[in-house]
Amino acid sequence: SAFSTWHELSRLIEQRMLDIYNDDAAARQLILAQHGLSEVVQADRQHDMELGDLMYKLFDQHFHLPVMPGDVDVFALAMELSDRVYARSVQLHEAITPRMAEEGKRVFEAYLGLYLPPFLAKR
């Protein structure tokens, strides 16, 4: 497969997200905009929860995951944290710069690394 470690899978996923943000202005606005539209924010949070669930399943499909906390959606939170980095880049530069794209990936991976050991056995 295209990856042998969870770190590589995490980078692959974030790169796909970045490709969507960069190719689709509407997606970028919806996900990254600093708007006060609470219902849009709610929808976005719901979207993050669903994506978090999908991401957990994707990681679980490829690796033997440790038991994850029941009270925190680690994968959804990792995405929200990296989204904040991308939003900051859009705020400052009106685009997600390569440097900030890299920082977002690092934030995503670093947060997951608090819950996933450095090495996970593949399925």
Which residues fall in each region the model found?
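Short, structured loop/turn "capping" segments at alpha-beta junctions
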Residues: 24-31, 55
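C-terminal peripheral helix-coil segments that are non-catalytic and often amphipathic
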Residues: 19, 53-61, 65, 75-123
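Short linear capping/connector segments at secondary-structure termini
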Residues: 1-3, 30-39
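Amphipathic, non-transmembrane alpha-helical scaffold segments
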Residues: 10, 41-52, 75
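Short loop-to-helix capping motifs
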Residues: 23-24, 37
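Residue-level recognition of alpha-helical structural elements
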Residues: 2-6, 40, 67-71, 93-101
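Hydrophobic alpha-helical connector segments
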Residues: 1-22
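Residue-level detector of well-ordered alpha-helical segments, enriched
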Residues: 9, 13, 27, 74-78, ...
